[in-house]
Structure formats: C-alpha cells, structure tokens
Amino acid sequence: MSTPLPPRLPDSDSPPQQFVPPQSQPSADVLPFPQAAADAPSVSASPSADVLPGVTSPQALPDTAARRPFNLPGHFPFRLPATHSGRVALALCVVYLVWGSTYMAVHLSLESFPPLMLSGLRNLFAGIGLFIFAARRDPVWPTFAEVRNAAAVGTLLVGLSSGMLAFGMRTVETGTAAVMVATVPLFATVIAAIAGRKVAKGEWIAVGLGLVGIALLNHGDPSSGSTAGSLAILCGAVFWAGGSFLAGRLKLPSDLLVSTALQISLGGAMATIVAWVSGERIVSMGFTPFLAYLYLMLVGSMAAYVAYAYLIRHTSPIIASSCMYVNPVVAVVIGALFLGEVITKWTVMATLIILASVGLSFWFDYKRRGLV
C-alpha cells in the first residue's frame, strides 16, 4: 500500500522465509516485502530464535549492517546513535511515527494527485532511489527470472494494494483507513486456508473477531466514509495478503535491499502505467500536496524500510512486530490532532477489537511455528 506493512503472515507450513522490509506494518505502506523461500537458507526455528516468524536467523541474512545501510552519501550532518540500544530506539521511532503518519501524507497528497498516480509515482522513484543506494553496496545481482517475479509481487503489493488504499482514502478518514489496513494478517489466514493449509480454530476465531471489528468500524462510525471507499481499502488489504502469499512461493532476489527496490520500483511503474492509460492526470500541483508526496517517497518509503530492516535483523519478533499495533493508534491520533478527525466510541471499540484479533492471529502463527 501507499502499505505497511511487520511480522510473518500466516500463509503456509513451508520452511521459514526471509522478509524484506516495507509499505507493511500497517501504515499506508502496510507490511514488509517477503522473500522467496527458495532464497532462504535452512534454519532451525526454536522458541529462543531472535527472528521474526518466517524470517531466517540474523546470522543467515546478508550482512546488511556491514554493508552500510545507514551510511548517507557525502558529509550529511546527521549522526546515528553509537550504541545498539540507541539504534533500536531510533529505528522504532522511525517505524512508529513515519508509518503511522503516512496516512495523513496520503490524505494531503490526494488534494493534487489522482490515487493510482500517487501510488505509482511515489513508489517508482522511491524504488529507484533504494536501487541506487543498494548498488553502492556491491550487491548480488538478480537473474531475469527473479526480476520478473519481483515485478509480479510488486504489482500486487505496491501497484494494486497501495492504489486501492489511496482510492479508498478519498472518502475514508486516515485513522479508520489505518485500522482497516491492520486486517492484512487476517486475510492472509483466509488465503492460506484456500491454498490448503490447515487453519486452527483459534485462527478462524481471530478472523471472525476481525470481521466484527470491521463491521463496527463501518456501520457504527460515521467517520468511516463511503462504503465504496471502505471496500477499496479492504481490497487493498487482500491484495497485500495475496502478494505476500505469492512471494513466499517465488524465487526473488537474494539481496534484501535489491529485492525491496525492485518490488517497489517495478510495482510503482506498473501502477503509473495503468494510471496514465486509465486517464489519470495531475491537473494542478499545490505546495502542501507536493511536500506530502516528497515525505511519502523519501521518508515513508525509503527511510522507514531501512529502519525496519534494522529491526528485523537486530531485535526480537515482539519488538519488530510491535508496529502492527502502534501504527493504527498513531494514525488515529495524528488524524484527530492535525486533520480534525473525530475519535468516536465506535472508533475506539473497533480498533481494540481488530488489534486483538491481529494479536490472536499472530499468537497462533507463532505457536504453530514453535516460537512460543
């Protein structure tokens, strides 16, 4: 989406897979981009493993930190914290605040950008920037098949998912949209069941609880906007879950940053082409929408993905996945403070129910994988 989108999505009984960071905790970017299982070295999944469900052990991943993921070109005055705890705190602040604020940035950008064009252009140029950044690290270059697979996955995760989110947010408030995006893991459970994985009763309870929360959010809360907008956002969540499921079965580039850059840029390119063919045009450009667009591209897509990559590699699953619960709350608060959105009792109730259902879904997924 414009998200994202966090931890392992409950999609299959396949061996642990790599995840490349991005749009996913739930933000307007939603969840990180998953890597193909074929690319992941085999590891033992023990309860003490300091990795996300579905993520290879930090030792098995490319040494992203050693390849200077945070080094900035030139003599940029910003200095990163010297300690590990300081860098983790900084990465958490970036992921929490940036991905939680991208919903407001999308809202402001839509004053000048058509929805699909916004999704396409921001991700196209963000992906190109990440690709240039990755190229400076002398990465392992992908094969043609890996590029093709990255394009297919990126089209679902970025083109369709982010485009539908932006389309829905024309009529749905930012906080409501963020809470609805948090349902991605629930849709991932349904897709996994359709694909043949045995789903525990508790996981179905989580899905049902999430649907109750969605119903409360849309039928009890006047801020939920139009039905068409809400359906568009939910479709975006389905596309993201489907793209993540597909990514777990395709061979993607082994280098994390290269894979992320390709998925973002190629998905953005597809969205831009579709937007142009469908007649979307930028008629006029306001100063505020343009600044919001730059924020989405440079901070929401590029900086936040690098920060999430650091969390995946250097923290526990609980810490790394905490953005799944913090981002919707941040989005609701920012919408109320800066956009005048009303926080009703229905918003609070629906948010608590949906986040509880997501937590239940993750708990059963961790349990199934032997991580709890």
Cite the ranges covered by each PLM segment.
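Juxtamembrane helix-entry segments on the extracytoplasmic side of multipass membrane proteins
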Residues: 83-89, 111-120, 142-148, 204, ...
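Transmembrane alpha-helical segments that form core, pore/gating elements
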Residues: 116, 130, 187-189, 194, ...
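Specific transmembrane alpha-helical segments of multi-pass solute transporters/efflux pumps
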Residues: 98, 102-103, 131-177, 181, ...
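Small-residue-rich packing faces within the transmembrane alpha-helices of Major Facilitator Superfamily
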Residues: 100, 124-128, 211, 265-269, ...
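Transmembrane alpha-helical core positions of polytopic small-molecule transporters
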Residues: 96-100, 153-162, 184-185, 214, ...
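Helix-helix packing/entry segments at the starts of transmembrane helices
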Residues: 119-121, 162, 177-183, 246-269, ...
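C-terminal-most transmembrane helix of multi-pass membrane proteins
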Residues: 2-15, 32-34, 43, 53-54, ...
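Hydrophobic transmembrane alpha-helices of multi-pass small-molecule transport proteins
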Residues: 130, 153, 183, 199-219, ...
